[in-house]
Structure formats: C-alpha cells, structure tokens
C-alpha cells in the first residue's frame, strides 16, 4: 500500500492534513517532526508533508526536521511552518512579519510560461486560509516563487533548475482547511501528479487487510471484547468476528448508568450482527459503590475499577483483548506536543491487558472517527448504530452532577429520552455531533398547579463538531427548545426548570464532568 508521512510540528491542523490525504484514497500516517531518515525509510512512504507549527524557525525554541529527510529523494510539501523550515534549511531567510495574516486571504498564482507549476495546475486565483506571523523574506538558492498574497510575496515556493529533481514545495497557507476553496485539489496535484501515487486506500482494502492480520495474530486462541453498543466497540467487534467467528466472546456490562432501556436496546440490535454477547447485569454493584460520591474524578475511578472487576469475572481462556482505540489516541501519544495535560481521566479497559496478561487487538487504531463509520457501512452495520451520538464511558454518572443515586439517574434518563426523541422526530438528530441532558446539583423555585415547588434544574447540551476536538454549541430553533422544555417539565417528575448550554469547546468541554 502506497502511503504519505505527515511530520507534526504542533499544528492544530495536522490531523486534518492526514484526513484530507485519506479522502483522496491514499493512506497517511502522522509522526513527530524529529523522525529520523532511518525510521522514514522503514515506513517506505511515497511523499512527506511537513505540518504547520506554533514556533519560529529562527527562535531559541525552534523545532526543526532532521536535515537528512531532504536527501531521501522523496517529494516534500511544507505547509506554513513547514514552508519556513524548508526555506531555513536551504539558506533562505524567515522573519517576523509586521503584518500578520490570520483567516481568509487571496493568493495570485504566477502563470508565466517559465513559472508554470505542476502544483498549481488547474488551481484558480482564490481564497485560502492563512495562519502565520512569520514569512519568508529571502528565497533560498535553487527555489522560485509560484504564488503571492497581499502580505507575503513568497506565499508558495518550489525547487527548480539544479534543484528541480528534489521536488520540494512550500505553501504559506493551509490547503487542508475547508476555507482554502481548492486546497484538496492542490493536495491531489502534489500526491497524484508530482509524487505519482496511485490511490489504493479504501474501507474495503482496510477490512481485507485487517481480517488477514487478525487471523494471523489470534490463531486458534479465543478473544474477548468489551462492547458498549457505541460505534467504536461495535465496529471493532464485528470486524474481529468477520476474521475469527465464534472465537470472539463479547461482554456487555450494564452498570445502571446507561440511557433509558439501553441494555435491552443494545442486546436487540447486536443480535443480527452474529456476535456472541454475554450481558453482565451489575447495576446494583456500580450504584452501591457510587453512593455519596460527588467528585467527578472519584466517580470515574470507581467506575473504572468496578468495570475491571466485573470484566475479570468473564475472562477464562481468552488470550487477546479487543479495544476500539482510534488513530487520534495513537497520534496523541507520539505528538510533538508531548503528553497533554490530563483534563479528565479516560474510562476504558486500559488496565486490563497488563493485569490479565492479555495481548491487544486494536483493529481500528489506524482510523479516524468518520472512517470507522465508513468501515461499519462496508461491514453491513445498520446506519442507526453507526450514527449514534458519542456516550461517555462512565455513562450518566458524569451527567448527574454531584452524588449519584437510582432516583436521580431515573430522572435524567426520562428527561434525556424526551430530548433525543424530539431531536429525531424533528430531523435534527443527525445535524448535531452530540446531544444530551445534564441533571444539575441545584434546585430552583417554581410554581406548578398554584403550588410552590423546589425541584431540580436540567441543562440541555447539543454541539456541532467533526471530531469532538473542538465544538460549537448547536443553534437549535427556539420553538424546538420550548417544546422540549415544556414536555420535560410536564412529563418528568422532579424537574421544574430547563436551561440550554451555549458554551463552545474550548473553553468549555463537551461533557460537564
């Protein structure tokens, strides 16, 4: 399989570069900016892309690529900081710009006969997305300018003349961002026409490769998978099942913190998928251990430890554990930015493999979320399952703020069911990335039936996003919100006030806890 390496210098858009490449049918991987030529050779890519980054190539904190990558004979495209790293390496000059460029900008491509560029073939003068405070002020020897903007005379450069064979290109703007109107076409020109890559990455080719790999790794051993009914674990389980059939044993843990009637619904929709699933009813155990606990971090840790205990009871002869790890999780562990500050503990079965001496099978670790759904469709999984909104591992324990008890969980389940039901009936469910209700640890005064009430406050949350890394609050119609609020207050005993969360991520997170 032909591939492209993206070297990460810390740009917020690095994952977007990799995704745009895959949309062209080409497999891409993200590695740290410091990756050595030897490691690059092991990956055997057909091209390299240098991402943007937040530092300056001339500063004390400059992060620069290994100089040996420019001698590998591979086509290289530098984006924003990547362009500046190229100019710096080949003897050009990069300086702070007196006039920064952030947002949309118009670029002009040099179309004179002696400047005709393969990179800009079929690319009209158009708006692109800029995000830089530095710019190239002196062209390195053996390079030429192919495009300019109002603030950057050297908005695009490429090797030519004696260096033409190097096939090194640089762009000051971000072709991977949707605001760069013809950016994807430009990436296609680089990868297909200049690097000569033949697209061979697809959901089907991925599935075929994974099935072969899973069979080889698992052999005749049995495999266990914790399945939640979410997109990732369901697709992972079905993919492994396609490879090894009845050797796979799935366990669904009902912790009493799921959506209303979730356990029954999940077991029902898993039936047609041909999976062998055991339902572990552990509602009382989880809720007992959470009694009186208000700290969200403590709740997460209790749920994580309890999940491991329950899961252990179902491990017998299994040698492998299936996990639904996705590519963003893998990227985070090797990113230029290093380990991120822990905002919340992640609830997963990460403690199981080492503790139980289980080997991992992570069939989705090369995929982004949208690719997981595409693989699910190829596997024949129903759209209702694939398009379910994300649900936190600790479940409603982090949506019932404060201490958790069965009564408060039931109130939240009933309210959330109304919210989701109305979103679906109004055709709004698929228009938002995620929607849910939060039961707040406060009460408010109200009047119902001429009587004073003092009951719970509920918050509704709906966000729009592509990957959950950033999100904007969904601008749901006011009449829709009024209908949902009215139904909840009238139909759910214990709630007399409904609020709508209009916070974006950042600065807020999507979940409240």
Swiss-Prot record:
UniProt-annotated binding residues for ATP: 228-234
Cross-referenced Pfam families: GATase, GMP_synt_C, NAD_synthase
Known pathway: Purine metabolism; GMP biosynthesis; GMP from XMP (L-Gln route): step 1/1
EC nos: 6.3.5.2
Glutamine amidotransferase type-1 domain mapped to chain residues: 3-200
Superkingdom assignment: Bacteria
Enzyme class: ligase
Sections of the chain in a coiled coil: none
Domain GMPS ATP-PPase: residue ranges: 201-388
GO molecular function terms listed in the Swiss-Prot or TrEMBL record: ATP binding; GMP synthase activity
GO cellular component: cytosol
Record's signal peptide: none
Residue spans crossing the bilayer: none
Catalyzed reactions per annotation: XMP + L-glutamine + ATP + H2O = GMP + L-glutamate + AMP + diphosphate + 2 H(+)
Xref: Gene3D superfamilies: 3.30.300.10, 3.40.50.880, HUPs
Function: Catalyzes the synthesis of GMP from XMP.
Matches recorded under PANTHER family: GMP SYNTHASE [GLUTAMINE-HYDROLYZING], GMP SYNTHASE-RELATED
Subunit: Homodimer.
Record protein name field: GMP synthase [glutamine-hydrolyzing]
Organism: Chlorobium phaeovibrioides (strain DSM 265 / 1930)
């Amino acid at each position: 399989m032909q591939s492209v390496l993206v070297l990460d210098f810390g740009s917020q858009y690095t994952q977007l570069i990799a995704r745009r490449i895959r949309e062209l049918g080409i497999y891409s991987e993200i590695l740290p900016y410091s990756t050595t030529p030897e490691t690059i050779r092991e990956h055997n890519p057909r091209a390299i892309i240098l991402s943007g980054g937040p530092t300056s190539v001339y500063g004390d904190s400059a992060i620069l690529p290994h100089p040996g990558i420019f001698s590998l004979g591979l086509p290289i495209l530098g984006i924003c900081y990547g362009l500046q790293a190229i100019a710096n390496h080949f003897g050009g000059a990069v300086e702070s710009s007196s006039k920064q460029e952030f947002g949309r900008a118009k670029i002009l491509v040099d179309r004179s006969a002696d400047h005709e560029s393969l990179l800009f073939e079929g690319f009209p003068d158009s708006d692109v997305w800029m995000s830089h405070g530095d710019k190239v002020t002196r062209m390195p020897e053996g390079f030429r300018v192919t495009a300019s903007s109002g603030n950057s005379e050297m908005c695009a450069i490429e090797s030519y003349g004696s260096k033409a064979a190097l096939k090194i290109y640089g762009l000051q703007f971000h072709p991977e961002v949707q605001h760069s109107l013809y950016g994807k076409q430009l990436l296609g020109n680089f990868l297909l026409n200049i690097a000569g890559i033949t697209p061979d990455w697809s959901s089907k080719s991925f599935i075929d490769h994974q099935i072969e790999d899973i069979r080889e790794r698992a052999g005749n051993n049995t495999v266990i998978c914790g399945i939640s009914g979410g997109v990732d674990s369901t697709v992972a389980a079905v993919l492994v099942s396609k490879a090894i059939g009845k050797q796979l044993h799935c366990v669904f843990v009902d912790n009493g913190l799921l959506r209303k009637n979730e356990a029954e619904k999940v077991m029902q929709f898993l039936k047609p998928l041909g999976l062998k699933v055991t339902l572990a009813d552990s509602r009382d155990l989880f809720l007992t251990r959470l009694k009186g606990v208000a700290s969200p971090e403590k709740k997460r840790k209790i749920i994580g430890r309890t999940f491991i205990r329950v899961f252990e009871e179902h491990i017998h002869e299994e040698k492998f554990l299936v996990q639904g790890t996705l590519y963003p999780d893998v990227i985070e562990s090797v990113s230029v930015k290093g380990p991120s500050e822990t905002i919340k503990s992640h609830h997963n079965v990460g403690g199981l493999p080492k503790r139980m001496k289980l080997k991992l099978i992570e069939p989705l670790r090369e995929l982004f979320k949208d690719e997981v759904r595409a693989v699910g469709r190829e596997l024949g999984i129903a759209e209702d399952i694939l398009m379910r909104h994300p649900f936190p591992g600790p479940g409603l324990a982090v949506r019932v703020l404060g201490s958790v008890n069965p009564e408060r969980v039931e109130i939240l389940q009933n309210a959330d069911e109304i919210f989701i039901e109305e979103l679906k009936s109004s055709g709004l469910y698929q228009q938002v990335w995620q929607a849910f209700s939060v039961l707040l640890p406060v009460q408010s005064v109200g009047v119902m039936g001429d009587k004073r009430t003092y009951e719970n406050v509920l918050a509704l949350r709906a966000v729009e996003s592509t990957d959950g890394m950033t999100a904007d609050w969904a601008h749901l119609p006011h009449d829709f919100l009024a209908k949902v609020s009215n139904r909840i207050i009238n139909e759910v005993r214990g709630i007399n006030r409904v609020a709508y969360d209009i916070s974006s991520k950042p600065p807020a997170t999507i979940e409240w806890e």
